Amino acid sequence: MSSHTSTPNHASAAPPRKWYDMTSAEFYVYVVAFMCGISMLMPINAVFSAPSYMLQYYLYATKDPNHVPQMTNFWSNVMTYYNLIGLVTGLVMEPLTLLKSFRKIPMLVRLLGGLCILIVEIIVLMAVPARGTTEGGAVATMCIAGFIGGLGKSIFESTVYGMFGAFPPSFTSIMMGGVGISGVLTSLIQIIVKAALPDTYEGVKKQSYIYYSLDVGIQAATFIALIMMRFNSFAQLHFGDLGGVKSKVDAGSLAGAGENVREPGAEATELEQYTEPAIGQIQEKNAEAHKDDPLVDREHSDDVDEHGDALRAVEGPTSNEILRATSIISVLRSIKWMFVSCAFVFVVTLFLFPGIATGMFPESKWFATVAVFIFNCCDVLGRVAPALRFMWPRSYNQRWIIVAASFARVIFVPLLLLYSYHYIPSEAYGYVIMVIFGFSSGYVASMSLTLGPQSKGIDNDGKRFVAGTLMGISILVGGTIGTVLSIMTQTIREKY
């Protein structure tokens, strides 16, 4: 490759594309990315949106509204334990998805399998109370459901992050927006349902059925949308057909990444490197990159031009072969700072939220509900902020700003701990701090997840997929550490 390709040429870079230039196939992939984001956290959001049902699950499992619990510590912290079981399961399982044996499984199978497991999680939570069991059985059910949820989430999440890591960065931003919308949607429904139904034994049961039915419906819609995406031309251009057939992009190509073609490791110094050309421009760029390559099948290319099928111009290895040939360690070295940034965001967020951040007014019927809703709304605003160009670092070398912002969020620890001890007794303070806390969490996490697969040295689809998967693991690492710290802190507070 000639030396001029390693230096960004902004004059020749494709201009930003207008929304009306988007093809229907590309729009459909955006919709699927959004739906995948919603589905990713919908089960845990549905569970957390019915806290009364979870905190008193033993009443419904035993079918006894007057049952006196024997395992009081477990039920007092059931939400935290449930979340921790899922996180630990994911922390163990998600790295296993990077094994070569697992990477042989077609992506579509992984996606649909993960969704099915997440649906089973909700079915278990609803089926056991329908048949009835003991309090011990209720505890076992919660642990099993948490494990099932963690297993399904690890498979689905790692594949989604990896898959959309191979697409232009705006798809990751849209997917992250869906993750945030999932929380907003469940919080909004929680407020409506809480106002409409009484907090009685039967009222709480109806509330839980509403949340869980919504979850299953969304998962089913995503299931169908993913099956249809297998036949989507835009998806095929970026990562085969999700089923393990020949990829339409060769293993070393940068086509579809929304970047200028450059040598591996060449530094992308300006924001314009992330602009996304139209499909035709991608194909022209790919052809230009290979025009001097003697290995390219000229006769095949001429035949493709004759039939007008640009998607078959370069037929590379299968998407699974690309994945198996990718070095995990080298990818981790390339994304290490974005990995650390993303992990630390979730250390702080899950250390403080929801337990410490919303538990200071237990006698208030609405404080926790409204605080969670505000957090979720601001979180989704932060997650979609990277869709705005001015919210990105101005150059590649300014990525340190995202890492610094991640570590700067540690300031929320003393602010919210002091608030939880009522040194600042105002509920209004809690609402205001949730605005900043939620937006910063969503923005820094989304930017880290978006920039990770766009790092130096991540120069083909296989590396982008692995980078996206590793960024998903960073969420689990940070979330697990934060949740453990939260449990330890709240246990100490109960004793002292």
Curated annotation (Swiss-Prot):
> Which Pfam family would be a valid example here?
Nucleoside_tran
Extracellular topological domain residue ranges: 48-77, 129-135, 194-208, 358-365, 421-431, 486-496
Record membrane topology: Multi-pass membrane protein
Can you name a GO cellular component term? plasma membrane
Q: Which InterPro entries match?
A: ENT1/ENT2, Eqnu_transpt, MFS_trans_sf
Q: Which family does it belong to?
A: Belongs to the SLC29A/ENT transporter (TC 2.A.57) family.
Q: What is this protein called?
A: Adenosine transporter 1
Q: Which organism is it from?
A: Crithidia fasciculata
Q: Which gene codes for it? A: AT1
